[in-house]
Amino acid sequence: PEELIVVGSGVTGAEFAGAYQALGSKVTLVSSRDRVLPGEDPDAAAVLEDVFRRRGMNVMARSRAQSAKRVGDRVEVTLSDGRVITGSHCLMAVGAIPNTECMGLEEAGVRLRESGHIWTDKVSRTTAPGVYAAGDVTGVFALASVAAMQGRIAMYHFLGDAVAPLNLKTVSSNVFTDP
């Protein structure tokens, strides 16, 4: 895209903003937080934000997007303070909510957290006998590698094998940006 507005400065937002900037797009990164990558190491995040700015990215800290709409062949993003920014495209990277409503999970005995995530123990069991859950819907480290491990643990546990509980202290993650 010619001019990309990325709403959200977490890992996904930072990765896409950096990638599209490297491909030649003019990028505006809208962050509701004080800095990019708010959940990551502050020193590393500061370096990344500095590089983004030096490369020409418009990083808008403490700016919350209120709405986005198509206007002709453009996109308008209205911020909560009334400012409006425009671009050719907009990418929303503001997180996800689990799709667990109206599925009858609670009626089946599956306990949900207030956030809508499915409660599981360390071997992926839910509160309903014989029902397991794995992946982002559990609200545990939204990483593909963690989801795959949760799934393997659930399968082996269900089959009666001895399993080691998921140990989140040993999970590593990457942020795919340059730098």
What is each PLM-predicted segment?
Residues P1, I85-A162:
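FAD-site-proximal beta/loop scaffold in flavoenzymes
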Residues E2-I5, V11-E76, S80-D81, F141-A148, ...:
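Rossmann-like dinucleotide-binding cores of NAD(P)H-dependent redox enzymes
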